[in-house]
Amino acid sequence: MVLDIIKKTLREYNLLNNGDSVLVGLSGGADSVCLTHALWSLKDEFDIKLYTAHINHGIRGEEAKRDELFAENFSKKLGIECFVLNADIPQIAKDTNVSEETAGRNVRYNFFNKLCEKYYINKVATAHNRNDNAETLLMNFMRGSTTNGLCGIPYVRGNIIRPILNVSRDEIEKYCSDNGLEYMTDSTNLTEDYTRNKIRHTLLPYIQKEFNTSFIKTVTENACLIKDDSDYLDGIAEDFYKQHIRNCAVNIEDLNKTDSAIKRRVLRLMLRDIYNGLNDISSTYVADILSLADKSSGRQINLPYGIVAKNEYGKIILEHKKEETQPFEVSINIGETVFISELDKKVTVSETDMRNKDGAVYLSCDKTDKIIVRNRRNGDKFQPMGMNGTKKLKEYFIDKKISKDKRNSVPIIEINGEIAAVGNRIDKRFAFKDKGIKIECDDN
């Protein structure tokens, strides 16, 4: 019966193709033993080549060594090559400032990826089952989650496949018993030190006993229905994203034309891009970012790992937090090139008797004039070309919608103590006539 369920899952979700090489994560527990044996039984029918991978996490001492030897021997009996990695997960977790669970997951999938690259393996099979799915759904619901989190564990994500996701733990243990398969028991799975184990050993049995004996089946089937709806909304959000998002920025006016369900998904897509994934990004951050749309320009919030979200002149922007440009002032003579470290740019001043449309700044200037390149100071004013009177630099930046964090990076050209240009905007008193200087500002 279990093999029939697995075969149906493999075909329904197109998890395998003829000729696939599959790496099975083999911990030695009942789930991974069942998965390994089932795929081994089906390898000729599906024309696949199998490998196994085992990680000794360095947490349970002799018990972990026992599991390692079991995984190697079990694989050998089936004629499957087994790869083993020994890792000090507690130390890695400490060094990288993450939980042991997160460190273990990172090490595990990094190991899988390296093996796939080295041995040209194109699929990785993990032993998540229906009970795992129910536990994940309850965990996500209790800690707060998006709709996607209530869809449960996916059958396939990238090259990761989960062939026994529709098989219950009871069915797995019966499969092992019927086929005479031994398996190892992780003692930490029998304790209640971790949230998932409390759900597994206390909450789920209580719900099944007091409310619904088929709760695991019910909740995972409901998750499939939620996923159908969620996939439809995700598609709409993806279309919006392609049309309206540029460099992790979205016009608030465009965003507000969509429904709240689409707004949240669009923001999660932006977070996915800037974080290169969504691990550890709470739905609370999505709500916080969305609230920026109702606030004034210039408001911002700090997100984890050095990311900032801000409302900037009608846009919500996500970007890596930048260090503020420090004050600088550099003297330069005609015919010289200077490097300004605060801008990481080279500035070149040359004499010229003609003006081109090449993006450079052209100013009237004599050879004896004192030229300085600096950034803004309090009280700065200038007389922009095409405008009447004097303009405060602060007002000019606001009019040009130059954000506060970028204003210190705008180069200001000063001649004989007067502002001659702000960026590419020339002061009319220094407008180029018959001859003068050409100023070029290039990346280093």
How does the language model describe each region?
Residues 3-9, 13-31, 49-51, 55, ...:
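AMP-forming adenylation/ATP pyrophosphatase catalytic core
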Residues 142, 208, 271-275:
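Hydrophobic/aromatic-lined pockets within catalytic cores
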Residues 186-190, 213-216, 279-280:
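Short, surface-exposed loop/turn segments at secondary-structure junctions
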